[in-house]
Structure formats: structure tokens, C-alpha cells
């Protein structure tokens, strides 16, 4: 099958077929990636918020959202509209510039990271050759926005929440990057498309989760910590810090923090799907499937079926992980700040280093299995 392609090429060729010049086609493409990212991210957040509220209600033997649309499906949209029209209050002693820039600096890197996520065989907004490196670089910007928001609020609870968020993010960013580096080493590429293609040779047996089980666990723990999900929600612990760095925020600025958090959760689940669970790949080989139905793999019908099911597989794997994250929220207690830092620096960091060294050794010893 064809490898994942850049949507820009398909769009440009389609516009040129209508008689427009290449320069005009490229100019028309410029705003589309961000539009696609915003639409997919917002839809992902709306679904995730609804799922979380319904699952949380089930865990507490409640009904949950019910009146806004069928089964309360429109409740997240109603909440967003409510926050949109609420008054935007800036504390009198706050730094108004940093207070405003902080939430934006938290949200923008998370949205930009969606550019590298391949949703299907031929559904990729930007096939960046260094996609993984770009994602790690963008994710390192978010703690600056959190610290800026906490500091600029001129509130002791906000400042403590911002400091906790920065410490937590730095502590878990390193083992997260080392876990991803082991995948990059096996795939010989920083491209998310190449990583998925490398996993789709023998069905689910070729998924990276079997060759990197330790890396998978490290990545998932670090991803939950980066998203500040329970049991790692220390920066906004209600019993200790009111709402952490969000304490003085209201209206749409307050909503931006939650929007960034849920977008980051869905993004992390998608990246786990791409890096460890074969992305758009099926549990069975597509070659075996095409031979089973008696059609060539190059048959247009097989290509359409594979592309459509590939998108479904990517989203299904991601939302299974989102479901797991929501369950963890209601089944695990919050850790203390010293336990959180000890887990990152004394446990996950050494294990991720050992995992990287073992992966390098196995790559040399078994190049066919570990991508030599």
C-alpha cells in the first residue's frame, strides 16, 4: 500500500486541475492546516468531555448530562458557550500582559502538535520528517505558560500551582523523551508516518508495544503526568491550592486551560496509538485480508476500505486509552508532591535510560527484529 502522504500535495494538485496556478494553490492551502487542526481538536475535546462526565457519573451511580441534546451530548458545547459569555476579570494587582499571554502560551503548542498526527493511511496534515522532535520541542513550551499564569496572578495559591506544574512537567519530560527515543531508534526515523509503517508488516504482532512494553508504560505514565490527570493533578489540587494556577482566572481564559488539558489528553492517546499500537494498522495484515476476500491489494475497493477502517482504528485505539485515563481518575488517589518527583527522577528516569540502552543492544544483536 502507499505510504502516508502529505495532504498539501493532494490539495495542490486538485486545485491545479481546476486551472489555477501552483502559487495560488499553495496560498489557498496556508490557512487550511490550522483549520483542520482546530476542527479535529475541538471535536475530540467535545467527545472527551462528554465521555468523562458520563463515565464519572456512572462511577458515582449518577445519570450525568441528560437534557442538553440526546444523552446530554451537547452539554460540553453548552458549557463552552457559558464560559464564552462570562465576564473576564483581571485581578487589580496582577500583571495583565502575562496574565493574558499565559493561557495562550499553554494552548497554542498543544494545538500545533496535532499537525504531526497521522489519522489514517493518507490522512496527515503535515508529513514533517522530524515530527517527533517537533512534538517534544513544542511540549517543552507549555510549562512556561503555566508558570507565567501562576506568577502573573499575584496569588500565593496560583504561584504554588505554577511552580508545581513547571516542576512536574520538567520531571516527566525527560523519561518521556527517552521512551520515545527508543521507538525512534528502532524505526530509524523521526517521522510519525514511518513509525506506523514500520509496525504494519505482520499485523498486531509487529506493533511496538510487544518490543517496547517498558517504554509503553513509561510513556503512558509520563503522558498522564504531562496532562495533569489524577493521580498527578498536583498543580491544581483543590484541597490544597483552591484551583492552582487557574485560581484567579474566569471566563474564556479559564476555559483555555481546560481546553488545552483535554486536547493534550486526546493528543497523548493518539501518539500512544501511533507509536506503540500500530496507528492506522489492523490487528491482521492487510495483505492477508486482501487475499482472504480474493482481491488485489492495489484494488481501489481494498484501498478505500483500508483507508476508512484505518481512520476508525486510530481513533478507536486512542479513545480506549482516553477511557482508561478517565477510569484512573476515579480509581487512584492523588500522590504527594515528593512522591511525584521521586517517581519521575528516581524511578522512571533510570528505567527509561536502561530501556534505551537495552534497546540499542537488542538492535545490534537482532537487527531484523529491532530495526537494524
From Swiss-Prot:
Subcellular location as annotated: Cellular thylakoid membrane
Which keywords does UniProt give here? Answer: Membrane, NAD, NADP, Plastoquinone, Quinone, Thylakoid, Translocase, Transmembrane, Transmembrane helix
Keyword NADP included in the entry's annotation: yes
Enumerate the transmembrane spans: 27-47, 97-117, 128-148, 166-186, 204-224, 266-286, 308-328, 347-367
Any one of the GO BP annotations: photosynthesis, light reaction
* Catalytic reaction annotation: a plastoquinone + NADH + (n+1) H(+)(in) = a plastoquinol + NAD(+) + n H(+)(out); a plastoquinone + NADPH + (n+1) H(+)(in) = a plastoquinol + NADP(+) + n H(+)(out)
Q: Which domain of life is it from?
A: Bacteria
Under InterPro entries, the record lists: NADH_UbQ_OxRdtase_su1/FPO, NADH_UbQ_OxRdtase_su1_CS
The way this protein sits in the membrane is described as:
Multi-pass membrane protein
What's its EC?
A: 7.1.1.-
Q: Name one GO molecular function term.
A: NADH dehydrogenase activity
Q: State the GO CC annotations.
A: plasma membrane-derived thylakoid membrane
What Pfam families does the record tag this protein with?
A: NADHdh (PF00146)
As for family, the record states: Belongs to the complex I subunit 1 family.
What exactly does this protein do?
NDH-1 shuttles electrons from an unknown electron donor, via FMN and iron-sulfur (Fe-S) centers, to quinones in the respiratory and/or the photosynthetic chain. The immediate electron acceptor for the enzyme in this species is believed to be plastoquinone. Couples the redox reaction to proton translocation, and thus conserves the redox energy in a proton gradient.
Subunit field text: NDH-1 is composed of at least 11 different subunits.
Protein's name in the database: NAD(P)H-quinone oxidoreductase subunit 1
Gene source species: Prochlorococcus marinus (strain NATL2A)
Q: Which gene encodes it?
A: ndhA
Amino acid at each position: 500500500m502507499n505510504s502516508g502522504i502529505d495532504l498539501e500535495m493532494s490539495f495542490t494538485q486538485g486545485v491545479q486541475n481546476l486551472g489555477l496556478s501552483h502559487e495560488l494553490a499553495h496560498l489557498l492551502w496556508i490557512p487550511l492546516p490550522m483549520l483542520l487542526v482546530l476542527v479535529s481538536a475541538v471535536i475530540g475535546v467535545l467527545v472527551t468531555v462528554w465521555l468523562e462526565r458520563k463515565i464519572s457519573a456512572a462511577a458515582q451511580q449518577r445519570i450525568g448530562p441528560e437534557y442538553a441534546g440526546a444523552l446530554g451530548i451537547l452539554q460540553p458545547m453548552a458549557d463552552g458557550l457559558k464560559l464564552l459569555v462570562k465576564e473576564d476579570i483581571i485581578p487589580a494587582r496582577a500583571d495583565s500582559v502575562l496574565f493574558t499571554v499565559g493561557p495562550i502560551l499553554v494552548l497554542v503548542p498543544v494545538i500545533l502538535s496535532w499537525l504531526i498526527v497521522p489519522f489514517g493511511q493518507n490522512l496527515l496534515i503535515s508529513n514533517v520528517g522530524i515530527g517527533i522532535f517537533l512534538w517534544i520541542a513544542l511540549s517543552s513550551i507549555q510549562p512556561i505558560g503555566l508558570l507565567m499564569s501562576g506568577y502573573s496572578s499575584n496569588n500565593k495559591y496560583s504561584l504554588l500551582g505554577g511552580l508545581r506544574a513547571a516542576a512536574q512537567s520538567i520531571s516527566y519530560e525527560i523519561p518521556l523523551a527517552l521512551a520515545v527515543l527508543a521507538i525512534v531508534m528502532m524505526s530509524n526515523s523521526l517521522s510519525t508516518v514511518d513509525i506506523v509503517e514500520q509496525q504494519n508488516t505482520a499485523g498486531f504482532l509487529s506493533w511496538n508495544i510487544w518490543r517496547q512494553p517498558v517504554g509503553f508504560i513509561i510513556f503512558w505514565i509520563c503522558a498522564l503526568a504531562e496532562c495533569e490527570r489524577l493521580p498527578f493533578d498536583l498543580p491544581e489540587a483543590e484541597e490544597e491550592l483552591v484551583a492552582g494556577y487557574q485560581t484567579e482566572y474566569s471566563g474564556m481564559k479559564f476555559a483555555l486551560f481546560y481546553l488545552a488539558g483535554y486536547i493534550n489528553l486526546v493528543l497523548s492517546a493518539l501518539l500512544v496509538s501511533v507509536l506503540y499500537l500500530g496507528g492506522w494498522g489492523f490487528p491482521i495484515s492487510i495483505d492477508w485480508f486482501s487475499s482472504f476476500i480474493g482481491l488485489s491489494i492495489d484494488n481501489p475497493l481494498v484501498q478505500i476500505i483500508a483507508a476508512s477502517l484505518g481512520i476508525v482504528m486510530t481513533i478507536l485505539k486512542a479513545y480506549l486509552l482516553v477511557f482508561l485515563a478517565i477510569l484512573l481518575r476515579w480509581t487512584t488517589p492523588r500522590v504527594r508532591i515528593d512522591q511525584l518527583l521521586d517517581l519521575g527522577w528516581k524511578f522512571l528516569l533510570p528505567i527509561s535510560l536502561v530501556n534505551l540502552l537495552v534497546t540499542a543492544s537488542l538492535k545490534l544483536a537482532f537487527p531484523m527484529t529491532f530495526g537494524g
